[in-house]
Amino acid sequence: MRDPRKHPVPGDVLTRFGTTREVTAINRNDRGTVTHVVYGHPTTDTPQKEATISSWRAWTKLDAMVVREGAA
């Protein structure tokens, strides 16, 4: 079973401390390794943001709640 906190895919929605993020895209390097996560807020029209996979995993560490899982 995939954990969206560690292995995000487009469509995943996570929340932590009142902040909600929806994964919109995943950037990979030439070898296929995930390097960056592009995310935004699921209901407001705010600019998309890009985070490294390590900062994404640090943000979701332990206390982030999965609201919705995207199709893997």
Q: Which role does the model predict for each range below?
A:
Residues P8-D12, T35:
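Short structural boundary motif marking the start of a folded domain
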Residues D12-E22:
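Short coil-to-beta-strand transition motifs
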Residues T43-A72:
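Intrinsically disordered, low-complexity, charged/polar segments
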Residues K6, T15, N29-R31:
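A generic structural signal for short, solvent-exposed coil/turn residues
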